[in-house]
Amino acid sequence: MYISNLRLQNFRNIHAKSFDFKNSINFIVGKNGSGKTSILESIYFLSHSRSFRSSQLNRIINHNADEFIIYTKAYNPDEITISLSRKKNSNNISKLNLEIQKNHTEITRNLPIQLINPESFNIINSGAQQRCKVLDWGAFYLDKTFLKIWQQTKFLVKQRNSALKQNYPYSYILSIDKKLCEFAEILDYKRQAYFTKLKPKIYEILSHFNPNLQLDIDYFRGWNLHKSLAQVLEESFNYDNKYKVTNHGPHKADIVLSVSHKPIQDIFSRGQQKLLICALKLAQGEIHNSENDNKCIYLIDDITSELDSIHTLTLFNYLKQLKSQVFITTTEKNKINEFIDTNSYILEI
């Protein structure tokens, strides 16, 4: 997949502009407030039907307008068009090849995105839910049945929590547990299948950044490895019932990062943590590209302020090997001069 043209109308501070891009590394250069990150945000929005910058979607619409429109022409390898519009206090309207979509799933499948921005580096210090999203992103593209299993599992956990809060009888909780255990086992299997591919790839890429970094990467499924979920839920019922929430299950899954059984945030410097996240994101893209004809697109926001020049060069070289389309923003052109080659494209705004 690569985007050849992007048109924005009333998207943040961009009133009406059209941008052409190359199927290579695209540098977007401009001062703060010029709209660089808004271009990345619009591409991300097309893929995910949401922003990575704000949950207040009405604020994305230009203050002089009532609606924003994002339109792109892309190749996968055949030409496709994707558009998304949103009016104030209304829902998103998504179109794939001019056909309105009932949900955004097919567009997300057609437009796989990996984002690296300053907030990405908080994955290590965030809760398990953020790290579990790494697994779910990969499993979604690896296995077309994953989404339905994930949705059903999420529904059952929510249903169980609601039943606990409303003091439903234990027999009713057990009826939910039976279904939850069935779907949780399948979800765990699919996550484990992706993690098995991801773990060695992270190690491989991280060695390019810093061969001296040592860490352990483990998958925690959300409950005791040596017990069935049914047994764990039964044993923890009194505790769950006391606090009115389900404390064990696939919603508690995590990627555990440690060094000699100590959390890496206690061992790794901030710079080393950033290298690990870059390796993680690159690993996800490489696995995706090897399993799909539809290559992953990278959105990288102001990376030169996050990594030193040596590690930035390592990142760029690896991105070139992936042969994915890449969008990189920067405030200063001189920061990227050493990374530009004949295949690069520079957009100054």
UniProtKB/Swiss-Prot annotation:
Stored SUPFAM superfamilies: P-loop containing nucleoside triphosphate hydrolases
Pfam families for this protein: SMC_N
Gene Ontology BP terms: DNA replication; DNA synthesis involved in DNA repair; double-strand break repair; SOS response
Positions that bind ATP: G30, K31, N32, G33, S34, G35, K36, T37
Alphabetized UniProt keyword annotations: ATP-binding, Cytoplasm, DNA damage, DNA repair, DNA replication, DNA-binding, Nucleotide-binding, SOS response
Principal location: cytoplasm
GO MF entry, a single one: single-stranded DNA binding
Localization per record: Cytoplasm
Keyword DNA damage: yes
Alphabetized InterPro entries for the sequence: DNA-binding_RecF, DNA-binding_RecF_CS, P-loop_NTPase, RecF/RecN/SMC_N, RecF_2
PROSITE patterns: RECF_2
Entry keyword DNA repair: yes
A cellular component term, taken from the record's GO annotations: cytoplasm
Family: Belongs to the RecF family.
UniProt-listed PANTHER family: DNA REPLICATION AND REPAIR PROTEIN RECF
Function: The RecF protein is involved in DNA metabolism; it is required for DNA replication and normal SOS inducibility. RecF binds preferentially to single-stranded, linear DNA. It also seems to bind ATP.
The protein, known as: DNA replication and repair protein RecF
Organism field: Francisella tularensis subsp. mediasiatica (strain FSC147)
Lineage per the UniProt record: Bacteria, Pseudomonadati, Pseudomonadota, Gammaproteobacteria, Thiotrichales
Gene: recF
